[in-house]
Amino acid sequence: MIKTHNWTEQELIVVFNLYCKLPFGQYHKGNKKVIELAHILGRTPSAVALKLCNFARFDPLLQKRGIKGMQHGSKLDEKIWKEFNHNWEELAYRSEFVLADLKGEKPYAEIEFEQEQYLMGKEREALVKIRVNQNFFRQLILASYRNRCAVCLLPEADLLVASHIVPWSVDVSLRMNPKNGICMCALHDKAFDKGLISVNDDYELIISETIKILFKEPSVQRGFIPYEGEEIALPDRFIPDKKYLEFHRNNIFIP
């Protein structure tokens, strides 16, 4: 039965979950994932699509592009947006559990645990949370960059990584913040992680002298030199925070 009453907080949480996982431009009633979620919630695909667009209107980057939802959208929409953006760690995890419960599944059904049989209690619960959130973060970052490397535009998802700008080991509170993420291919992710490349405040790629001295190598000429000084491909939403990029340049990048 199709619902017509007001949206609940639980429903909006799972709609925002989908908002994070779909590339911008796919928030429409004909999208298979929109239709699937509408069926789960007992809503029409049009209603779910409209909620997705309403969430988009809160994103500062999309606001600059003139993206608008309903002029008088629900205050609860804004509440959910703010809650996620203030606490990605908990809300992402909660949204995965709510969605899994609605589908009658385990939130970690598709996630493999190498030593799961040896874990118990809080230790296992903590690992589950980390893995569930890692999976969510990856989907969010890849979708925001339309499944392309920000440096070379490689479009193969199996070769893409949701790179953290400020590493987990430095600030665990940022590990789920999408503004602390960049989608990169495996090559450029490793170079970024090792400080061989970075990004300036104009979102242009900078390359370490460690790489530049190898400029005669064909692999370096193909994989790095063409992108130096070029603006990286920016995401449709959750643009990298400049203060995180500054941290990377000052603490990880090798000039």
Regions found by a protein language model. Give the residues of each.
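Short Lys/Arg-enriched helix C-cap and helix-to-coil transition segments
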Residues: 60-80
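Short helix->loop/beta-hairpin flanking segments within DNA-binding domains
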Residues: 19-29
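Short alpha-helical "recognition helix" segments of helix-turn-helix
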Residues: 33-38
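Short, Lys/Arg-enriched anionic-surface-contact patches
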Residues: 1-18, 128
